[in-house]
């Protein structure tokens, strides 16, 4: 495997470092005063910079937490923040089953106290042609999958979210056309890639409800809809699993969903992206989209010999 080189975010993606450090200092002070707990809106995580973290800081916290796609809480970008307040992310259990020798049942509250939590500052590219840079805190998915000891016949990983219509009003909206629960999938080698993260927090705090609490998938070289939120079950399979958006519109949303500026969505271009949180004298800032979202050196070999226009 090639030596990892962290992709350097573009200047337009980055906010001043002192703003982020100031925020982390305030968070630490709150923890020292005992101001947060495991069930508070945002609890401090004991995290450390991971091997794939950069020294630059992300999109403003307000944008990251108030511009979201999470259809379980509604179709609008502001709906997740306003409609998720009654959602209870704890207690929570994560199951890893299927083609494994050692099925795993994890108490997420224990995961939140894990010393293995790393900070990873990643680009996030939405299929809707907008982007952010987000400081995730989480555990490499490969770490948990290895604990389950995958069977040699396993080729894919299926992810399933939770169904709680009483707490997730979007699950009662027939207009969405979505068959709940939300489901996603990866090839096993994609899931085991060092970049793939099971995120438990952002900005050094537990995930807000609107960002996928208590845990979500982060695959930075793929479009954001692959990042399934509020994961309840993970299963290892010997075949490609169905996925929500591919099932809804297979001509628009492929199974792989790798960021590719040369393959347009049928209804819009993917060549450029609108940078959330960045402004200029001429309005919203746009920048060129990078192949594999800038992570090609780390993941391109996964797709060697494949037709990426066909396998989009």
From Swiss-Prot:
* One GO BP annotation of this record: protein repair
Q: Does the keyword Metal-binding apply?
A: yes
**S-S bridge residues:** none
Against Pfam families, the record matches this protein to: Oxidored_molyb
Q: How is it modified after translation?
A: Predicted to be exported by the Tat system. The position of the signal peptide cleavage has not been experimentally proven.
E.C. designation(s) = 1.8.5.-
Q: Which GO terms describe its cellular component?
A: periplasmic space
Q: Which cofactor does it need?
A: Mo-molybdopterin
What does the record give as the reaction this protein catalyses?
L-methionyl-[protein] + a quinone + H2O = L-methionyl-(S)-S-oxide-[protein] + a quinol; L-methionyl-[protein] + a quinone + H2O = L-methionyl-(R)-S-oxide-[protein] + a quinol
Q: Which GO terms describe its molecular function?
A: metal ion binding; molybdopterin cofactor binding; oxidoreductase activity, acting on a sulfur group of donors, quinone or similar compound as acceptor
Entry protein name: Protein-methionine-sulfoxide reductase catalytic subunit MsrP
The answer, when asked if Oxidoreductase is one of the entry's keywords, is yes
Q: Which residues bind Mo-molybdopterin?
A: 68, 71-72, 126, 161, 211, 216, 227-229
Hey, which family's this protein in?
A: Belongs to the MsrP family.
Q: Spell out the subcellular localization from the entry.
A: Periplasm
Relay the cofactor remark from the entry. Answer: Binds 1 Mo-molybdopterin (Mo-MPT) cofactor per subunit.
Q: Which UniProt keywords apply?
A: Metal-binding, Molybdenum, Oxidoreductase, Periplasm, Signal
Give the source species.
Gluconobacter oxydans (strain 621H) (Gluconobacter suboxydans)
Q: Which domain of life is it from?
A: Bacteria
Q: What is its main location?
A: periplasm
Subunit note: Heterodimer of a catalytic subunit (MsrP) and a heme-binding subunit (MsrQ).
Its annotated function is as follows: Part of the MsrPQ system that repairs oxidized periplasmic proteins containing methionine sulfoxide residues (Met-O), using respiratory chain electrons. Thus protects these proteins from oxidative-stress damage caused by reactive species of oxygen and chlorine generated by the host defense mechanisms. MsrPQ is essential for the maintenance of envelope integrity under bleach stress, rescuing a wide series of structurally unrelated periplasmic proteins from methionine oxidation.
Signal peptide feature range: 1-42
